[in-house]
């Protein structure tokens, strides 16, 4: 079954904006994944550096804002020097297979219990590439996620989760479990994660991208250090990897 073949009823012949084109691509991927729980997708990498996908990724990264990474390049600076050139450079590097992510910049934010939560801030460039990759692979995993899962999911919200809890209470369910997995992001076993990703993705270039982000390292106090386990909090791709693990254990 070809992803490119067939037109969904009601869908326009041509999608005009990057957002519409990306949504059309995502719909095709989701439908294919939903139809077959065992299908592994192999032709994904070229879609990541499509112009419309990169433009939509930039729009989302810009909307999210955030600080600069280790290269000190800000969103504002990119806009001043030219977004089109910035994205063209990313596209060329990805197409040539020369993309290498930078280490994430370590920052700490206070937690309610007085402790500090470590965050890893990727460069804007890496956030755009991660967002582009997420746009392509997320629909595949979304087809597998549980209906009762609400965290970090498109078209899902905390309000919907609360409504589901209210409805469960009306049906006689009267227990709520509040749990926290200590050091979850820092202790994810990468090989386990990659095995889960490989269940749905066979495109080696996409698998390489994900592994590169996991192994990019952390810069703290001017020094770069390797990390042997975990995935940095703060990355665009991190919530998707988290959901993949939880879905597998559901």
Where are these regions (language model features)?
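Short alpha-helical scaffolding segments that buttress acidic/His motifs in well-ordered protein cores
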Residues: 57-61, 132, 209-214
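Amphipathic alpha-helical interaction elements
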Residues: 46-49, 63, 67, 138, ...
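Conserved phosphate-binding loops in nucleotide/dinucleotide-binding enzymes
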Residues: 118-119, 123
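Conserved polymerase palm-domain catalytic core
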Residues: 86-89, 93-108, 112, 136, ...
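Duplex nucleic acid-engaging cores and interfaces of nucleic-acid transaction enzymes
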Residues: 124-132, 166
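Non-catalytic, polymerase-adjacent accessory regions of viral genome-replication enzymes
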Residues: 1-81
């Amino acid at each position: 079954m070809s992803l490119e073949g067939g037109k969904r009823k009601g869908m326009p012949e041509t999608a005009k904006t990057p957002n519409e084109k990306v949504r059309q691509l995502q719909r095709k991927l989701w439908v294919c994944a939903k139809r077959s729980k065992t299908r592994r997708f192999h032709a994904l990498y070229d879609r990541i550096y499509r112009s419309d996908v990169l433009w939509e990724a930039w729009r989302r990264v810009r909307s999210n804002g955030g600080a600069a990474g280790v290269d000190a390049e800000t969103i504002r600076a990119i806009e001043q020097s030219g977004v089109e050139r910035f994205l063209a450079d990313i596209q060329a590097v990805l197409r040539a297979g020369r993309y290498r992510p930078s280490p994430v910049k370590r920052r700490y934010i206070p937690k309610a219990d007085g402790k500090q939560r470590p965050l890893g801030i990727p460069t804007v460039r890496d956030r755009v590439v991660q967002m582009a990759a997420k746009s392509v692979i997320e629909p595949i995993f979304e087809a597998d996620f549980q209906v009762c899962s609400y965290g970090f999911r498109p078209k899902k919200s905390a309000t919907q989760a609360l409504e589901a809890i209210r409805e469960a209470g009306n049906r006689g369910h009267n227990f709520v479990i509040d749990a926290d997995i200590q050091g979850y992001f820092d202790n994810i076993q990468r090989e386990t994660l990659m095995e889960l990703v490989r269940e749905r993705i066979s495109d080696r270039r996409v698998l390489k991208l994900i592994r590169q982000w996991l192994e990019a390292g952390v810069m703290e106090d001017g020094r770069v250090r390797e990390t042997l386990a975990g995935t940095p909090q703060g990355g665009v791709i991190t919530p998707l990897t988290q959901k993949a693990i939880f879905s597998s254990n559901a």
